[in-house]
Amino acid sequence: QVLSSAASDVYKRQGMEVNKYESQPHRPNIVGIPKGSGNGPVLMMNDHMDTYPVVEPHKWDKTNFKPFEATRVGDLLYARGSSDTRGNLACTILAAQALIEQGIKLKGDLMYCFCVDEERDGTHGSIYLTKNIGIKADYSITAEPTAYGGDATKGDWGMNLSIANGGHCLIEVTLEGDKAHIWRPDTSNNAIVESAKLISHLEIMPFTHEITEFMGHTPPCTTIVRIRGGLPGEM
């Protein structure tokens, strides 16, 4: 809510028409529009204001273990969300300011759209704005710093252009085994052991697809993100 209010205030000072759209209390999406001089196409500059949670605060030594407090170290600014996507938000705001200061008149409308829900699934952000509010644009540029670069060792991760995102799906697999005493594994079918076999198979599973001609398109992949095992109450 604080970030939404700050962005809204900046755009209002820049003379934009600003609207707030809430799907959840105290989490307004911001849409700022500097009107163009004609009936040209609409270009949306899109970004998100929510931040991925911190799960290992003890590793944030650059911020004195306070990941939500921005800390400058040399020419770098460290904080949870500094690149994903506070830095991008700042660039978008400065780009809007530059157009205004230069007195550039566009034939079409620019639309600056800052959403509150991207890290989860977009239900209360872009999806809500398009399906419930009816926000539309002819073209869109999303300042998301995770465009696929092919070789992360070259330091180009997130610094690439991508024409689209392939999307993702979450799949939960449950394996059931046969319970037995720990000294008699020969009499059981251990679901944990079987899951290890499944994971090994998923790691080498081939994907049958045609390589897209669009630059930066993320290739298909499988990522194991969580494993739970055992029965509640067991020692």
Residue ranges and their predicted role:
Residues Q1-A7, Y11:
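Single conserved hydrophobic/aromatic residue that forms the stacking wall/gate
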Residues I30-N39:
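Short beta-strand-to-loop junctions in surface cap/lid or active-site-entrance loops
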Residues G40-M111:
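Active-site metal-coordination/substrate-binding segment of hydrolases
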Residues E194, M205-M215:
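Conserved, helical-rich catalytic subdomain that frames metal- and/or nucleotide-binding sites
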Residues M215-M235:
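A structural supersecondary motif
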